[in-house]
Amino acid sequence: MIYCTVCSICVFTPWIASADCSNAPPQRIVVFPLYAEEIIYGLVEPERIIYVGHHYAESGIDDWPTMIKSQQVAGECWENSDEEEILSLNPDLLILDSYLQDNFEEDFPAFFHSTVPTLFLDSPKSIDDIIHLIILLGDIVQKPDAALSMVNEMISSMSSIREVANKIPTNEKKTVALFGEPSIFFDLVANVCNVNGLYCPDEQSLAVANPDIIVLLPYCMDGGFLLDIGKEYSKDCIVQLESESSLSRITAISSGAIYALNFHGSQYIADCAMRLLKIAYPTFFSD
């Protein structure tokens, strides 16, 4: 078992590789975390990725940036994945979430006893974490220039977003509630956009919060398995909220301020942050 652990992402552990592959970039990558998948697809040729952490769903092409790129790639959440199937694809790099490391031998015995280099990643919790993660993955796949370009573009976009967000008067700060399906990156995006971000898992907490804006993820999961995704799913969720009479007094619902929005822990954070900023403070973008 050859592996590298990246804890807190900002602290790098040197990449460990066997003598046979130390000078060659990985060509057959298995990547489970979606945030890492988004970065990797932005750095390497699509054919270098042979397995991802979700199945392909055509309805999600507009909601997950890498969905169409992974159309011809095998994939499933780690809970439903088949180690032997994955190993039969002859991977030369496995990328997993760090929370899987403690029980790695028990949950993935075949991976554990293989010689495939494995990288464990903590989910990024800040913009700096995302930057460091992009640089790290760029080094591992031997695309440092592409990683630096990706970082510079993201920093430029985030600077523009912060410039607008910092102009928001305190008394105009909006409350945005993420309802239903959670996202570990919601708070990060909310902070960037200068909104009061709240997570409301159910209708009762939503009624108590009475947010100005409600956002829903455009997909639903069950234990990591993608159940549904896309515009029709989002539309059904919004209609269901709007038709619930007990919630009609909520500011966001009475004003029709309900939106489907994805949140990213990758270079795509700039895209979702800009969209949330325009939703929350449209007057700052009027011509």
Each model region followed by its residue ranges:
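Flexible, glycine-rich surface segments
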Residues: 180-224
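Solvent-exposed, polar/charged alpha-helical surfaces in well-ordered, non-transmembrane soluble domains
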Residues: 37-41, 84-88, 109, 131-135, ...
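A short, structured surface patch at a secondary-structure boundary
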Residues: 28-89, 93-104, 194-198
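Basic- and aromatic-lined ligand-binding clefts that recognize polyanionic substrates
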Residues: 25-44, 144-199, 263-273, 287
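N-terminal hydrophobic or amphipathic helices and topogenic motifs
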Residues: 1-28, 34, 38-41, 90
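Short beta-strand->loop
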Residues: 51-54, 76, 95-99, 120-125, ...
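Extracytoplasmic ligand-binding site segments that recognize negatively charged/polar headgroups
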Residues: 59-60, 102-106, 121-136, 169-188
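Structured C-terminal subdomain patch of bacterial secreted/periplasmic proteins
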Residues: 27-28, 81, 125-142, 148, ...
